[in-house]
Amino acid sequence: MNNFVKQVASKSLKPTKKLSPLDEVISLNECIISFNLDNFYYCNDGLFTKPINTPEDVLKSLLIMESFAYEKMIIKGLIKILISRAYINDIYFTPFGWLTGVDDDPETHVVIKIIFNSSLISIKSQVIEYLKPYNVNNLSVLTTEKELSINTFNVPDSIPISIISFFPFDTDFILVILFFGVYNDSYCGISYISPKERLPYIIEILKPLVLEINMLSDEIGRTSSIRIFNSTSVKKFPTNTLTSICEIVYSFDESSFTTPKTFTPLNASPYIPKKIVSLLDLPSNVEIKAISRSGVDFITHINNKRLTTILVIAKDNFLKNSTFSGTFIKENIIWKGIYTYRIIKSSFPVPTIKSVTNKKKICKKHCFVNSQYTTRTLSHIL
């Protein structure tokens, strides 16, 4: 989490007012939850590399997670339980490694690092009870020797700067970070999460309380920062205590703030839902609209209907040099024994398959070769 905040805030100007800590210190312990997923077979040995973990890398990891719907359901459900009882430090899942930080790879499929100041017995029992129906194995819920002491500070007279991004551990939420000053080498402030639907309200609430808002915008393939400036007189932020910026996040309680009367329309979002698709999986003989941005081609409309989830096109060698920007129509075919597709109409240049004549239309199978029943999974013909 600390690495994520550092990366998200790296290009934003932050207050440099030096703060003095209070005598009160927040003491926290670390717990590591790890387990294997039953019947989960996956290997990326010799291929996987992720040296930095930028916000773009985190968004890519979340996109990869969409290809593992069952595993995502288990992990996301567990995260929702933990958020109400502890603070999430990081998540490990074999296909994408550590979600926000950089660390050694563990030996289990899933690891969740949390910090807490409540009862470990209660957390452990909730974890065990939740995972019981999912047949996980090698489950471990253990505290480490790592103890964290978080300094606290009074709210200074300086005006804070706010950064808004997606919350990496649950994209149903946005992350709101307010920077007030510094102590030694650490920035000091307070962090909140709020349902993503409340983003316009959060922005209007913050405007009279901060010098500026820097919102991370998901541009599909890259991120940008949108600066929103305050145009009204600044009011004092309604909190009494700050901490060093860390894993501690609070739920944003809108009742503690003045209700905004107007809202500015937003044409950007910290997180856009998306998943990877093969052109084989798209419907045949209907118009499909695609956009290309930052080296990523994605689909926004099918059959004149806007999609609620962006579909990122996974290109094969046949179309690797094509840029999908416009509309196209495709159809699935059996060509030389291979189940594939061809583009039959497009507003942009694409290579074509000149002949699709195949009288027998026999497709080579990956297994069950003697069966008269033929279909495909997402990866195989059988």
From Swiss-Prot:
The keyword DNA-binding applies. Induction: Expressed in the intermediate phase of the viral replicative cycle. It is found in: Virion. Keywords: DNA-binding, Virion. The keyword Amino-acid biosynthesis does not apply. GO terms for biological process: viral process. InterPro entries: Poxvirus_F5/I6_dom, Poxvirus_I6_C. GO terms for cellular component: virion component. GO terms for molecular function: DNA binding. Belongs to the orthopoxvirus OPG082 family. Binds to the hairpin form of the viral telomeric sequence. Might direct genome encapsidation into the virus particle. This is Telomere-binding protein OPG082. It comes from Monkeypox virus. The gene is OPG082.
